[in-house]
Amino acid sequence: MVVGEVVVSLRGRDQNRLGVVVGTDDKYVYVCDGKHHRLGSPKRKNPRHVASLSVTLAEDERAGDAGLRRALARLRDLRKGGTIRVEAR
């Protein structure tokens, strides 16, 4: 797993929730979703308990909790068969 990779939780209280890998060490990956687990307190997960979606977020999309929430909401919509919302900046 690499930093910025989008994963889905397979086990635990956060099962089926999307998150972004914000760090790794020898035994664990650290996952944030911007709401339940913010950048300041990431969720420590066993790598066997998450599955990669083969999507990596750009650094500006994962710069803050609000950016994480927006990016994950777009991906959640795509997984449900929706379309990507385009936001004006």
Segments (PLM) and residue ranges:
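Ferredoxin-like alpha/beta domains used as RNA- or RNAP-binding modules
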Residues: 1-3, 10, 20-89
